[in-house]
Amino acid sequence: MKASPSIDAWLKEAKAHESAPLCGMYLTHNGTVRQTAKAKVRRGEDAPDVSGMYFTYDQAKVDAAVAETYKMDGIYYVRAWLNEGELTMGDDIMYVLIGGDIRPRVVDCLQYLVGRLKNECVVEKELN
């Protein structure tokens, strides 16, 4: 498990970045380990609660996903951090920060990037 970053520090860095004058909104995502199994939450299946998870990721795929977000209209700042190892309830899984010109574009970009990270870049194994 890695030490979680400071979102306050991330925002300070983003607002000092050369892209800051183009950004009218910054949006963050903080994914955490929850008690309810993914199968129960997403598919309504009867599944036991989890005590944690084993989490890993492919850095090259993460870098590619982040690079793709910069191709989206109005997106000027992107940062992502992913944890790794054995995580317990409430531990941080990931942080994502998106900076862009207007709310709809920033919201869409966050949805896009978190989806790509979760579906293409990470491996999660729930622990009981």
State where each predicted segment sits.
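N-terminal, polar/charged subdomain of small-to-medium soluble alpha/beta proteins
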Residues: 1-93, 99-128
